[in-house]
Design a protein with these regions (language model features):
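Flexible "arm" and connector segments at domain edges
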Residues: 1-61, 67-212
Length: 212
């Protein structure tokens, strides 16, 4: 199988071959549970590629994310759950539903949050907050919850004193996430970039010590 340029259909065929009875032993034994961590890992590698501004890296990492979608769809299809066409159908329907001014009869852009709340039968802001995935990184989840609270007219608590226990330090991180949101800064990205800065400074310090 050697072509000048492969298509999405080729990717589906490759995954089916890998999962076949005489396919790759590692790929054959994987389950939704065993590979779910790779979805997160590949998504973050895509973010890193986007930050680099390198289009080839972005394309490569986008492919890795796409592979995870195809992998899960193949596993589900074998179990009689859903297939890749169901995935495509679901996202197409969702995008059409959430843009009625483009694909329906509405004249004004719809409120995405309002549509999602209705879709998920969320009657209150608290229910909407609980709808924010608990699997998200905590700072990202905090930012999303704070945004929903602000939209509903609620301000974040402005506690100045923080106890040095889990709940108190959690409140401190929550406050940091709120400040990031107010200044339009992604808290996860801010910490990630600071870590890169810290590693660079640490490396320079090590190099200076080696020279003495």
């Amino acid at each position: 199988m050697n072509q000048k340029k492969y298509s999405f259909q080729d990717l589906l065929s490759i995954m089916q071959r890998l999962r076949a009875a005489d396919g790759c032993p590692w790929d054959r034994k994987q389950t939704h549970e065993s590979i779910k961590k790779h979805v997160v890992e590949e998504a973050y590698e895509l973010v890193e590629a986007i930050d680099s501004g390198d289009n080839q890296k972005i394309a490569d990492e986008s492919g890795d994310v796409l592979l995870q979608v195809v992998f899960h769809a193949q596993i589900a299809a074998e179990e009689g759950g859903y297939d890749i066409d169901d995935v495509t159908d679901a996202i197409c329907r969702k995008m059409i539903h959430r843009h009625p001014h483009l694909f329906g009869t509405a004249n004004e852009p719809a409120d995405w949050d309002e549509i999602k709340r209705k879709d998920r039968s969320q009657a209150t802001v608290a229910e909407e907050m609980r709808g924010v995935s608990a699997a998200l990184p905590a700072l990202m989840r905090a930012e999303k919850i704070l945004r929903k609270a602000e939209k509903a007219g609620y301000a974040a608590p402005q506690t100045e004193d923080f106890s040095m226990d889990e709940l108190g330090l959690g409140a401190l991180l929550f406050r940091v996430a709120d400040q990031c949101r107010k200044h339009h800064i992604d808290p996860e990205l801010a910490l990630s970039r600071y870590l890169n800065h810290y590693i660079t400074e640490f490396e320079e310090k090590e190099n200076r010590q080696d020279e003495t």
